[in-house]
């Protein structure tokens, strides 16, 4: 068996990110063979990753990449359990490598990316002690595609017919700030309109009580029209110049907004509420496993 030197332990620590005692034990078990020790630790890491899989990952990062000719772009969301991990270099590297893979392979769905990156994901989970997941991915191709990334938490892709990359980015910035639900009023679903009507009637029950039916209908119509304008990108006042609507801005530049995609970290994920004492107890219990 090769001698287990301090230098060997140090090298294994640097290559795996694991603790000194874990590295020493792995080297002893592997007979001093560092490559075998790494393989064994990865196998062990896969087990740890499986244990972490049930933990809710609602933090993380959004990443975007646009082609040099602005004809295509990809946006992905990768989740972690804490925002702290999302700011660490190992996590950032995993996100960047995943984005490059998705872009290079022209992926339109997250499933093949998840499968391809599973080994790297398990290694990251084993190293950082948090659950990590590639959640979703969207690829957009068109005449002019632009993107905007707000920090690491909000990302937007905008697809234009006509126009230019600068306009696409400006509109993407607006989408990030204003969070429109639909492109235009014609795309608003009947379910969304019905829900808005129901909410309006419930909130204004006292005001409309005893009023004639036609008056109530006009009140509802006014609220629905306001909702359609607020929820539709093309009808929203442009954030940089509220005097012009986003749709008009595009039209003046000889462009038409074809579609947009907006990702925000953790949206739609139900995050469990855990009190601090319980969280500490859970971490202590996990450290003893």
From Swiss-Prot:
Cellular component, GO, one term: cytoplasm
Annotated stretches, region: Involved in Mg(2+) ion dislocation from EF-Tu: 82-85
Compartments, as annotated in UniProt: Cytoplasm
Function as written in the Swiss-Prot or TrEMBL entry: Associates with the EF-Tu.GDP complex and induces the exchange of GDP to GTP. It remains bound to the aminoacyl-tRNA.EF-Tu.GTP complex up to the GTP hydrolysis stage on the ribosome.
Pfam families: EF_TS (PF00889)
Domain of life: Bacteria
Gene Ontology molecular function: translation elongation factor activity
Keyword Cytoplasm among record annotations: yes
Protein name: Elongation factor Ts
Entry's family note: Belongs to the EF-Ts family.
Key words of the record: Cytoplasm, Elongation factor, Protein biosynthesis
């Amino acid at each position: 068996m090769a001698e287990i030197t301090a230098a060997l332990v140090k090298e294994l620590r640097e290559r795996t990110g694991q603790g000194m005692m874990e590295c020493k034990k792995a080297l002893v078990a592997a007979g001093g063979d560092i490559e075998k020790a790494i393989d064994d630790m990865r196998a062990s890491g896969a087990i740890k990753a499986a244990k972490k899989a049930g933990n809710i990952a609602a933090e993380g990062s959004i990443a975007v990449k646009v082609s040099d000719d602005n004809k295509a772009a990809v946006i992905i969301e990768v989740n972690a359990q804490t925002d702290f991990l999302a700011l660490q270099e190992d996590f950032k590297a995993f996100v960047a490598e995943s984005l490059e893979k998705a872009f290079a392979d022209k992926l339109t769905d997250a499933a093949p990316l998840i499968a391809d990156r599973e080994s790297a994901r398990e290694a990251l989970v084993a190293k950082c002690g948090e659950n990590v997941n590639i959640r979703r991915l969207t690829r957009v191709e068109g005449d002019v595609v632009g993107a905007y990334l707000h920090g690491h938490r909000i990302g937007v892709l905008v697809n234009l017919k006509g126009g230019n990359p600068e306009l696409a980015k400006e509109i993407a910035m607006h989408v990030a700030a204003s969070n429109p639900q639909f492109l235009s009023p014609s795309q608003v679903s009947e379910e969304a309109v019905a829900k808005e009507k129901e909410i309006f009637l419930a909130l204004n029950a006292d005001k409309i009580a005893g009023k004639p039916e036609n008056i109530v209908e006009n009140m509802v119509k006014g609220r629905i029209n306001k909702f359609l304008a607020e929820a539709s990108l093309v009808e929203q006042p442009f954030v940089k110049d509220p005097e012009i609507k986003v749709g008009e801005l595009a039209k003046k530049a000889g462009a038409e907004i074809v579609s947009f995609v907006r990702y925000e970290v953790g949206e739609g994920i139900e995050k469990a509420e855990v009190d601090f004492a319980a969280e500490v107890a859970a971490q202590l219990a996990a450290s003893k496993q």
